[in-house]
Every structure is written in C-alpha cells, then in structure tokens.
C-alpha cells in the first residue's frame, strides 16, 4: 500500500512529495534496520528506536499480542515515510495501543502527516468506547518540542505519568556483585527455559505466582521462543538472580547490536516476594559486567513512572523523558 502526500517546508527547501508505504517485512526489514542504525549513529540516543527494539516488537511483542492474546499485529500497522528517492526518512511504529514515530533529522515537519495517518489507519489497535470512539495514545519525547506543539494544537492532553529513557556506559563501570549469602547472579545459558519464562511472567503478574516455576506460564512462552528469531539473539543474553535452591528471583534479557555498540534491556522482572532487596540492581550490574567484556559502549533501558528509581539506583542516568498524549477520536 502506497500513499503520496505533499509535505510543506521539508528541510527549508519548500514543498516536497513524500511516499507513505505500509511495511512489508520481506521488502523493508533490512531497510528499516539500516535506517534505525544510521539514525542512532547520528543522534546517539533513543529518540529513534534502537534496531533491537524493533526486533523485540516483531519477534516478542507481536507474538505475545497476536499469537497469545489474539490481537492485531503491530507490524501490520507500521508505515514507512520515504522521500522522492525512496529513502526512508521516518517510521510510524505502533506498540500495542500506542503511536510512536522515528524521524530523520531535518524532516521534523512530517510529524503532522504521520498523525493524520495514525489517527485514521491505527484505529483497529485500540479498544472502542461505547460511543464508537477510541482513546488514541501518542508517545513523544519531551525533547522534541515541535511534536508537543502539534499535539497541543490538535487538542491532545498530556498524562501526568510518563516514561524515561535511561542510559549507562558499561566501559566506564567497574561493578562487583554483592548479594546476601544463598543468592547469586547468573547468566541464563544453562537454566530451564520454562522456569526462566515463568519467573519473568510472575514478576509482571504477581497474582499468578504460586511458587511453582516448573509450570508453563499463562502467557509468554511463545513470545519467549519467538525472540530467538531476532538477528540480534546470537549476541544477546539473560541475567538472573538465583537462590542456591534454584528459585529464580529476578530476570532480564539484554539485546546486543555490535554494529551500533548498543544494548537494549527488555524485559526486566522481579517477583513480588523478592522485591526491595536490591536484586534488580545486582542483576543489572551483572549485565554491565558482561557488556564491558564485550566492548559495548552504551546500554539503554526504558522505564515507566516510579520504576525509573530502580534503574537510577543501578547506575543508569535519564537522558530524556517521554510523555503520553491522549485524545478521544
């Protein structure tokens, strides 16, 4: 599917024609990864999605949403914005019931057209209200002022709570793992996959935690397996806090892209009965130690609301804040 639209004022060179193309994995995947890598190398931050995060959306999140929950695939509602030479200059990427964008420097004016498209084409991803409307959610970095202005102009309202982009530089760290007797930080290569997946699930769904890690979780195992299809999987790893009796306390997964020398840590989960003991901090220090051995320069983690404090305690610094903007349409 293609659209052609006129965008005004692109790069201060007057009007420009923009091609809008629905994402086709076979045709566009490599192009998108290249675009995201180039954007990161130029910006050196998470204003543009990391390539690993895009893979996580394809191979884990979409499997969870579609195959396990029966919802629409995000990938089916992803759009490329191309210039008249068919170079990607922007992406519309839904993540569940949210609208996200990645835009090349100099093309900031396409955000309005992206919103036009999103408000029309992404509707099936949102639950309908009784009156047939949807609560459309836009995710925008606070550092991108023109997006805030456009959202306010359109009547969007900003939530009080928001997200945080957090970064740490493994090559500058020198961590020693410090845990109480009977606990240890380990990597996940030799542990049972069902137990790891179930422990992660229990961290997000404490009411399901009956203490038994040997049972298949209610959801998440298909997406756990799906992640293995990512091109980044071979260089990626898990970090956990484990009791001597084999019980798993905390779990996280770390995607690694050697080309950009970045890591993306997602998900991070601590079971409720093991919280407030500093286990997430030590688990993430284990991640930093391995990334340092690998020579990775920057490690990123996204956090919502109060969870940012967990990552700050583990040595991460917040490099940008992210707001959630709502409008009923």
Residue ranges and their predicted role:
Residues 147-151, 311-312, 316:
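Conserved active-site tyrosine of GNAT-family acetyltransferases
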Residues 2-13, 95-183, 189, 323-328:
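Acyl-donor-binding surface of acyltransferase catalytic domains
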């Amino acid at each position: 599917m293609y659209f052609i639209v006129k965008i005004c004022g692109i790069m201060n060179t007057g009007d420009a024609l923009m091609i809008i193309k629905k994402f086709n994995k076979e045709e566009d995947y490599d192009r998108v990864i290249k675009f995201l890598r180039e954007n990161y190398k130029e910006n050196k931050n998470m204003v543009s999605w990391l390539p690993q995060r895009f893979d996580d959306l394809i191979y884990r999140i979409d499997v969870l949403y579609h195959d396990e929950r029966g919802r629409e695939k995000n990938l089916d509602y992803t759009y490329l914005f191309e210039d008249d030479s068919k170079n990607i200059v922007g992406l519309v990427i839904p993540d569940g019931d949210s609208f996200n964008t990645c835009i090349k420097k100099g093309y900031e004016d396409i955000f309005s057209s992206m919103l036009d498209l999103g408000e029309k084409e992404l509707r099936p991803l949102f639950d309908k209200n009784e009156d047939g409307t949807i609560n459309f959610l836009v995710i925008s970095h606070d550092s991108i002022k023109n997006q805030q202005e456009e959202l306010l102009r359109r009547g969007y309202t900003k939530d009080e709570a928001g997200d945080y982009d957090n970064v740490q530089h493994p090559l500058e760290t020198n961590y020693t793992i410090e845990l109480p007797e009977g606990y240890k930080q380990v990597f996940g290569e030799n542990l049972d996959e069902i137990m790891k997946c179930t422990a992660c699930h229990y961290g997000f769904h404490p009411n399901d935690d009956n203490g038994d890690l040997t049972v298949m979780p209610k959801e998440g195992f298909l997406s756990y397996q799906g992640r293995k299809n990512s091109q980044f999987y071979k260089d990626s790893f898990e970090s956990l806090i484990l009791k001597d009796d084999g019980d798993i306390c905390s779990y996280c997964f770390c995607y690694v892209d050697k080309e950009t020398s970045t890591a993306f840590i997602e998900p991070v989960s601590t079971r409720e009965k093991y919280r407030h003991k500093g286990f997430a901090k030590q688990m993430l220090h284990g991640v930093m130690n391995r990334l340092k051995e690998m020579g990775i320069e920057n490690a990123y983690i996204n956090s919502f609301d109060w969870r940012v404090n967990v990552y700050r305690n583990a040595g991460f610094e917040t490099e940008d804040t992210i707001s959630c903007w709502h409008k009923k349409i």
